[in-house]
Amino acid sequence: MHPEVLDAMRPWQDKFFANPSGSHRAARIARKAVDEAREVIAAELGVQAGDVVFTGGGTESDNYAISGSVRARGGTAVCSAVEHHAVLDPVEYHAGRTVAVTADARIDLDDLRCVLDSMTSAGQEVAVVSVMAVNNEVGS
């Protein structure tokens, strides 16, 4: 971890490690810090603070991104067949489709076109397409 990040986080690990959802003094201090961080990030991104969502990790983030997109836009989702289950599971839940990959683990663009065309022909809206840029398991 970058030394500046460690220095910024040290007070929250050593002294102010309260649950920011609590009602006691330490929790209120932690909540204030979370809210201030949200404001800083929102300003950097040019969005409202309420649009910035903190999650507990990657799986929760993937689920929120896919399910939130489907719920907000309607339709379903598409992902590659080699995605992590944090992506595959919500795509499956929303009756989405998977796209094949080539022998070297790249997205099969012909299959992607075919899947999207068949969904469009069937009147299915596609809210989100999620494909990983690299895969740590197969080295692509």
Label the predicted regions.
Residues M1-S140:
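Pyridoxal 5′-phosphate
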